[in-house]
Amino acid sequence: MRSKLSILSLITLIVFVIAGCSNDVTEKEGKEGKIVLSPKSDDIKGKVLFDSAHGQTAGSADWVINGGFSDFADALTKENYEVTDLGYNQLLNYDKMKDYEVVVIPEANNPLKASEQDAIEQYVKSGGSILMISDHYNADRNFNRYDSSEVMNGYRRGAFDNPTKGMNAEESSSDKMKDVQSRDFLNEVFGLRFRYNALGNIKVDDLADEKDSFGITKGVKAVSMHAGSTIAITDPDKAKGVAFVPKLSKDDAWNHAVDQGIYNGGGRNEGPYIAVSKVSKGKGAFIGDSSMVEDKSPKYKREDNGETKKTYDGFKEEDNQKMIMQIVDWLNKKDDDQDLSTMNVHLDDKTNLLNFEQPENSRENEKEPWGTPKQGYKWYDSSTYA
């Protein structure tokens, strides 16, 4: 299958050249290796690294720069950003990230190792910027019990004391689970957490004004959510919201929510849909739904059964593209402030959390994983992928 993918990548490159594509693809080795998309201009605005090593193509996901995130990648290169894919079998470390202004982690399905969390923290505190794009709770795409919000937060819901809870011996001892430790990571480093709520189809038009959003919301009227989550602000000196869902009722919850789905009745009490953070020399931005970024050009077949994926044109909806690009522009700029308290912006209140949102009190509401994978498929062993 990998050789077929390489041939398809070559064909795609030839088509781009014949069509006069606005990007020069300087290297394109497919899923297993590094992909670099360079703008034609020599005046590179910044360098952006995309993580693809944490299950970004699991299940129906295809969140890679030559697939379901290609519209995003193309928009970046048109704005003179150089865009690079980390590589399918790579781990995040400081040396890999340090030469990039922005690192994007799209809806990760495999957990970050403790060493990767440490590297992200070092990278940001040294002046780098991170963009994390999550999804609703129970979006486990490869049946490994981890949702993207759990991966990014740093712990599994209901398994804070044991990240391998419920796994068999082969899973728990696999390379994917080595050095995986529970940590309240986003809260400790960035002053926020992805909530484990699950909201349905929402038009998000309650936006922080341009001044209080560092220009991120300039010209933006609304962005969209199609089954997503919000973010809890735990330290207002570090983190603040820039886009908020409207007031909601129980009918606005995602149909497959494992609990009430909506925690604080929506509105600003629910926590922001999109948040930013200022940490030492660096920055972070966080989005509660991958639907806002995806496009309808998936590259790969499903890893569990080989079927064709279907993705959607979320990047083109509402003002999603404008908002996302302005997020990257803000992340690309350096600021000397150590946190938000000195940046002359309105600071948010802390989000009121439910008791079960404390990591040690969290619970697994339904049996996990939510489904049974095709016989022979093992999320932790790529040799079993279709």
Where on the chain are the PLM-derived regions?
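A glycine-centered loop/beta-turn motif at secondary-structure junctions
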Residues: 41, 203-339
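An acidic, glycine-rich "communication" segment
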Residues: 138-264, 376, 381-383
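Short secondary-structure boundary micro-motifs
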Residues: 3, 32, 104-105, 259-261
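Short loop/turn segments at secondary-structure transitions that flank enzyme active sites
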Residues: 14, 192, 290-293
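C-terminal motif of bacterial Sec signal peptides marking the signal peptidase cleavage site
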Residues: 17-20
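Long alpha-helical segments found as membrane-embedded helices
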Residues: 22-175, 283, 289-294, 301-386
